[in-house]
From Swiss-Prot:
It is found in: Cytoplasm. This is Fructose-1,6-bisphosphatase class 1. InterPro entries: FBPase_C_dom (IPR044015), FBPase_class-1 (IPR000146), FBPase_N (IPR033391), FBPtase (IPR028343), Fructose_bisphosphatase_AS (IPR020548). Its EC number is 3.1.3.11. Belongs to the FBPase class 1 family.
Amino acid sequence: MSGATLEAYLASCTTHGDELSRDVAAVIQRLAKAALDIRKLVNQGALGTVFNGMHSGSNTDGDVQKDLDILCDDQFLSCLQGAPVACYASEELENPVLLDPAARLAVAIDPLDGSSNIDNNISIGTIFSVLPAAKGPDVDPSQSFLQPGNRQLAAGFFVYGPQTALVLSLGRGTEIFIFSSRLGCFVDAYKSVGIPDRANEFAINMSNYRHWEEAIRLYVDDCLAGSEGPRERDFNMRWIASLVAEAYRILVRGGIFLYPADSRKGYSHGRIRLVYEANPIAFIVENAGGSATTSVDRILDLVPESLHQRVPLVFGSRREVARITRYHVDPNMIGERAPLFGKRGLFRA
């Protein structure tokens, strides 16, 4: 339904008599409305009263919260009041919030991903996951979020950039909607997005090279060696330091994103939050024909141990993601490389 409004698209995906799909559609429409309000705040830039303000507290990761982080979290929580949502979990909150115990859905969200980039006018966004709510007498709301990502009913992210976009998957493909100021709504601009299997771009923060494990170094060395190395073709490197912006680019034109675990304190288990960042991104990417792993294991098969658990994240073009896994698990991938591209690599550790 390319060119359809978000409302029309959701209506087309709602099966007659299927109350669960109607509930999912209702939640997505509420999130979209809240995102448009946040878009207005972000577009004010430094002119906005909450743009640069620092909150006195910190989030679950220990990061100092900006006032805009808190405002966005409040905005999304408020928009889901009265929606068919049993509980709400957020990066900004230590524990889930119970909304309607009788409702069927649970929503996990990163209200303002990339907020450290706000001052630099780089695209930021909101990432969300819609899950079936855990049921049972006296059930702990956190149980709704301790289920593998392959149980997600929907996932998406908003990008607040030159265009305001919604990337959405209901489990049957991935669509990209762009907000039309003329129509006042989101319009389907990229129908059934497909990530190419073959990639010529990779995104990673090269400043951490010395901290990576050998398999990641070797993969990057081979990409940098280009047509003169074992890959026998040239690669470009990208790094925006905004997960939603990186994911959007890969969905539109292919490539691979790597945020591996490394040897720094606090990074040995990765840095991307599984429940409300890695899982929704992986769901979106897989429904666009790509792959998402921890470098070895499929993201969507992981069972979260805690709400704010962190993991390494590699996603994008299927062949490249599979190659990185082979670098980790198949010693022959190292032995078969040309001597110049052996363990030493192009950079000294």
